Every structure is written in structure tokens, then in C-alpha cells.
């Protein structure tokens, strides 16, 4: 996997016309299933202790949008269109889209996105807190790679602790995250990158550390 290979950030993108236009509905039937195998894959993506970025262009609809929602950050090109469109065929999002869009946008906006089934422009979703950044179409590749490179060069252990606490706070509340903070912080205090950061701060000031991900 990405961790075993030494990766320190993951950039998810498509070299096709669209990020992902969703599933082929021609294969759907009344017993189409609940999406459990696929949602397990996205749960693992969401839980991976590395920063993840979805770089979205073209269409990200249905399951394609749900893939992006499983990432930590979503960056979209200005002409992209994103949406949970399953209700247009009488279905519901099956890959965690409802839960994750509510987590990002709040209950009212999340239900609006999931129930109306619209294709949204990225500027609107950025205002609603669903995506992180909108860039010009011809800037998406460079901008998303820049984010990924910055994160890959950062303190990986601290990033993992931040993700852990953010998930606990979202799922179980702030009090539970407070209780888990000491354990998460212990891993950071024991990291070699923290020592590198402290030493570089003393020697040459803030923002000069070269982190190794350990």
C-alpha cells in the first residue's frame, strides 16, 4: 500500500475526460445491493493516516463525488461539476455520500445536496464548505501537485494525529477527542520530526525544518 511504499501524501486524480461520472446505471437492478464492498474501500481511504487530496475536473457525480468526499481535501477546476445525483433515478447515495457531505456542509445543506440531486458548480460547494479550493482549469494539475508536495514534505506523524482527532471529534464529539488527545500527542512527542522541527527552530527560525516523515 501507499504507507508501505513510503508515500507521505496521496493525490487522487483522473487522466480521463472526467474525474468520475459515476456508476453505469444500465447494470443496476432492484437487488443492486447496498454498496457495502465499495464503501469499505472508501472507509479505508478516509482512514489512511496520510493526507489525501482529490483533484476534480470534468464531472464528479454519484459514486465519483463520494470518492472525492472520502479524501481530506478536494480541489476542483472551475468548470467541474459535482453532485450526488442518485435520486434522479430513485436511488440514494450508497458509498457514504450522505454522511460525508453532511459532515462537511452541515445537516441542512447536506440534505439539500443529496435530495435535490443537482450538479453543482465548485464555487458554490466551496462556499458551503464541501470543497477546499477552486482553481482555473489549466491550473488544477500544478495546484493540486503543489498541495500534495507541501503535505508530503510535512510532519507526517503530526498529520496522522490531526486526522485521528478530527475523525473522533466528528464521530464521537469534542469531549471524546479531548480524551484521545493525550494518546495522539504522545506519538507526536516521540516523533523524530518534532525533534527536527525544534532544532531547526532554535538554529534558524520557524518554517525551516526538513521533515522525514518519522
Give the ranges of each region predicted by the language model.
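Terminal peptide-recognition signature
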Residues: 12, 24, 51, 68, ...
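A short, well-ordered alpha-helical element
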Residues: 1-8, 30-33
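C-terminal alpha-helix plus adjacent terminal tail
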Residues: 2-3, 117-123, 142, 146-214
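Crotonase-fold acyl-CoA enzyme core
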Residues: 46-159, 191, 196
Amino acid at each position: 500500500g501507499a504507507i508501505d511504499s513510503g508515500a507521505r501524501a496521496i493525490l487522487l486524480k483522473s487522466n480521463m475526460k472526467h474525474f468520475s461520472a459515476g456508476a453505469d446505471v444500465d447494470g443496476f437492478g432492484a437487488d443492486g445491493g447496498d454498496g457495502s464492498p465499495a464503501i469499505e474501500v472508501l472507509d479505508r481511504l478516509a482512514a489512511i493516516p496520510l493526507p489525501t487530496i482529490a483533484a476534480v475536473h470534468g464531472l464528479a457525480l454519484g459514486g465519483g463525488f463520494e470518492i472525492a468526499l472520502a479524501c481530506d481535501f478536494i480541489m476542483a477546476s472551475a468548470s467541474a461539476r459535482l453532485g450526488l445525483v442518485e435520486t434522479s433515478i430513485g436511488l440514494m447515495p450508497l458509498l457514504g455520500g450522505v454522511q460525508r457531505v453532511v459532515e462537511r456542509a452541515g445537516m441542512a445543506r447536506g440534505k439539500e445536496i443529496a435530495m435535490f440531486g443537482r450538479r453543482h458548480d465548485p464555487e458554490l460547494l466551496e462556499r458551503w464548505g464541501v470543497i477546499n479550493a477552486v482553481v482555473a482549469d489549466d491550473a488544477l494539475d500544478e495546484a493540486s501537485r503543489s498541495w500534495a508536495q507541501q503535505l508530503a514534505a510535512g510532519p507526517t506523524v503530526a498529520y496522522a494525529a490531526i486526522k485521528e482527532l478530527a475523525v473522533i471529534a466528528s464521530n464521537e464529539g469534542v469531549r471524546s477527542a479531548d480524551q484521545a488527545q493525550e494518546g495522539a500527542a504522545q506519538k507526536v512527542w516521540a516523533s523524530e520530526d518534532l525533534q527536527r522541527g525544534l532544532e531547526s527552530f532554535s538554529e534558524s527560525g520557524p518554517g525551516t525544518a526538513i521533515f522525514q516523515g518519522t
